[in-house]
Swiss-Prot record:
<keyword id="KW-1133">Transmembrane helix</keyword>
<feature type="short sequence motif" description="PPXY motif">
    <location>
        <begin position="889"/>
        <end position="892"/>
    </location>
</feature>
<keyword id="KW-0812">Transmembrane</keyword>
<dbReference type="GO" id="GO:0005886">
    <property type="term" value="C:plasma membrane"/>
</dbReference>
<dbReference type="InterPro" id="IPR006644">
    <property type="entry name" value="Cadg"/>
</dbReference>
<feature type="region of interest" description="Required for laminin recognition">
    <location>
        <begin position="30"/>
        <end position="408"/>
    </location>
</feature>
<dbReference type="GO" id="GO:0005737">
    <property type="term" value="C:cytoplasm"/>
</dbReference>
<dbReference type="GO" id="GO:0005604">
    <property type="term" value="C:basement membrane"/>
</dbReference>
<feature type="region of interest" description="Required for binding DMD and UTRN">
    <location>
        <begin position="880"/>
        <end position="895"/>
    </location>
</feature>
<keyword id="KW-0770">Synapse</keyword>
<feature type="disulfide bond">
    <location>
        <begin position="182"/>
        <end position="264"/>
    </location>
</feature>
<feature type="region of interest" description="Mucin-like domain">
    <location>
        <begin position="316"/>
        <end position="485"/>
    </location>
</feature>
<feature type="domain" description="Peptidase S72">
    <location>
        <begin position="603"/>
        <end position="712"/>
    </location>
</feature>
<keyword id="KW-0472">Membrane</keyword>
<feature type="modified residue" description="Phosphotyrosine; by SRC">
    <location>
        <position position="892"/>
    </location>
</feature>
<keyword id="KW-0732">Signal</keyword>
<feature type="glycosylation site" description="N-linked (GlcNAc...) asparagine">
    <location>
        <position position="649"/>
    </location>
</feature>
Amino acid sequence: MRMSVGSAVPLPLWGRTFLLLLSVAVTQSHWPSEPSEAVRDWENQLEASMHSALSDLHETVPTVVGIPDGTAVVGRSFRVTIPTDLIASNGEVIKVSAAGKEALPSWLHWDPQSHTLEGLPLDTDKGVHYISVSAARLGANGSHVPQTSSVFSIEVYPEDHSEPQSLRAASPDPGEVVSLVCAADEPVTVLTVILDADLTKMTPKQRIDLLRRMRGFSEVEPHNMKLVPVVNNRLFDMSAFMAGPGNAKKVVENGALLSWKLGCCLNQNSVPDIRGVEVPAREGAMSAQLGYPVVGWHIANKKPSLPKRIRRQIHATPTPVTAIGPPTTAIQEPPSRIVPTPTSPAIAPPTETMAPPVRDPVPGKPTVTIRTRGAIIQTPTLGPIQPTRVSEAGTTVPSQIRPTMTIPGYMEPSTVTTPPTTTTKKPRVSTPRPATPSTDSSTTTTRRPTKKPRTSRPVPRVTTKAPITRLETASPATRMRTTTSGVPHGGEPNQRPELKNHIDRVDAWVGTYFEVKIPSDTFYDNEDTTTDKLKLTLKLREQQLVGEKSWVQFNSNSQLMYGLPDSSHVGKHEYFMHATDKGGLSAVDAFEIHVHRRPQGDKAPARFKAKLTGDPAAVTNDIHKKIALVKKLAFAFGDRNCSTITLQNITRGSIVVEWTNNTLPLEPCPKEQITALSRRIAEDDGKPRGAFVNALEPDFQAMSITVTGSGSCRHLQFVPVAPPMRVPSEAPATEVPDRDPEKSSEDDVYLHTVIPAVVVAAILLIAGIIAMICYRKKRKGKLTLEDQATFIKKGVPIIFADELDDSKPPPSSSMPLILQEEKAPLPPPEYPNQSMPETTPLNQDTVGEYAPLRDEDPSAPPYQPPPPFTAPMEGKGSRPKNMTPYRSPPPYVPP
């Protein structure tokens, strides 16, 4: 009984142990091997349960890492492939946009088929752009549910950036030709095609497609091309040594420059075959393929843009840093010594090489010096320098102490060249004379004059002298420079620049714009190197700077001398070019500018004249406005070379500008070419065309244009259009060599306007005088209307003598009517004479009057008075007067 109970309740010791081991084994077989797996399994079960219960809730979007940041360069194509397999799976939509925005930047284009992001940035797109790439899945309600997202940045660098990202991002094929790489001081030969297009109006895809279509002509990959807009209407490069035309007759848009490299330091003889560009550009095949008119092309050598030296702070507080010296090797180890150093910086043993192994100077090869910004401290040496080992104090003295530093940062190489060992006299510099080209319009390539011989490229001096020992310590900085120099300049005094090649002489012509680029090998400075690193100043003989109103100007930034002389500047002028280095020392080169008379004189076949609004004094007294006017006139004709325009005169009458075109041949008369040029700028009635107005705006406003033939076309009038005049054949006039060409326009005005007007006025005046004399003579002897009216009103009838009847004379009113049968009246009674003396008879007068009647016979016939007008009248309107008074007879007394 006891045994059964005892064996049933308490288990033996080995039984409990066996059960414990069995339970542990079973538990381990079902438990995960790692705690993380259990956690993940639990999270997956929890996520599945939450998704089944809350299917409408958005899930948290995880961030996917895998798209690296990139960089782009202005004018270069950018292309990057998005690794969509890391973001999206089957059935998901990829959306690419600017971070925080709905669309991409204006210069980027996303291609969903190839999953590439490409574009071509302009100067306005510089900076950092953040791009967001997200994957979304179509939800049950039709909306896109974001799944994953990633953000990366693209930094756009300026145009002159040294290493374009497009070369790295494009990932060219293994068999593709690598882009040309020139030496640091070697110019790059670039071919540029000018297009009549506006890049700001293009989409990013159109810009990339333009580069791809150009690949058929250039045989260069798009990422090796450069596409930039035209700045300040500079379509053509004045330094080009080859050029050719396109099919575009005029420029409408702002313009675009598409260029690529041809080689390094090429010239006219070493340029590769460019017929694949020259012929299609001229014939229009390139324009048809690209979709934009081609204005022309040119080839020029471009200087590489070397990184500028960063100004350092001289009095910076030195901070002790650890300097790692280059490894040294020695066959026999000499005894160690200690060289005193300032502030005893801790110098670690050489564990990492940041400079080439130390070797003796090799003739003809430069040495490398690593410098940092900060204070420079010279390390004194004791006795001759010998290779040593590291001493117990931790100071290392190498065989030749080299400048070393351990500050990590950006290494920027720069090259310092040595002056040339030989000097060659440079020939005279002259601007291309505006010669008369041939009438053959098929010429497509324009070559510059023969290349001027220059001195050979500077060769580094051969030296075996060890470089100056220098130990540099600097405060913490983030940049350091690697300077390659043929001759060390540390510690040497500043030397004056040297004149290597003289400018000598510059030729210019009256009324023609000229410009001269000062060559880079004119001066040389040991510290600042070539001329373009020096400061140039143009002065007169008395150390006076050239004024703003001078006819010749100089741009010290671009080192370009330009001007526009007039007839008063004919002759020789002396100027001085001063080159100053950074230390203030200068060198001088004296040269002459020879101004010649107009190349065509009075033989130009046509004279163009435009009337502009404004004050002519503001143009004639400002050389910059005058040059701007010449450039605008050349631009209106489609000529980028301003020397094709010769300014003849600027007169009053608003602004009357007269010029000639040097591209026209003198003989025979180029009537078709002049007509084409005239129609380019003016209508048939003399009104300016819109292209001419736009070319002159906003500085000048055109009012009217006149194109008159001269020289071989002197009998033609082009604008306003007039029928040609027939001129009788006559012997050619003798040319006057000293005639002032500026007076020819005034002579033409007098000949065609003033003299005919004076002749017509004189003829009209003489005709008027003759008509007046004839009128006066015709009116002489006639009464006026007043006189005629007076005579008619106050006059009496006139009876002439031949109108009277002689048989019966009319009775006269002056005699009494006496009948024939009547007897004469009795005589008056006689009175005695004893009358008083003081008394007079009353009829004394009557008795006296009729006294003769008493003496006559009473039987005599009565008195017959003469007719009234027996004699001619003494005057008009006079009336006969009775001289004797008449009185009535006495009363009749019958017998």
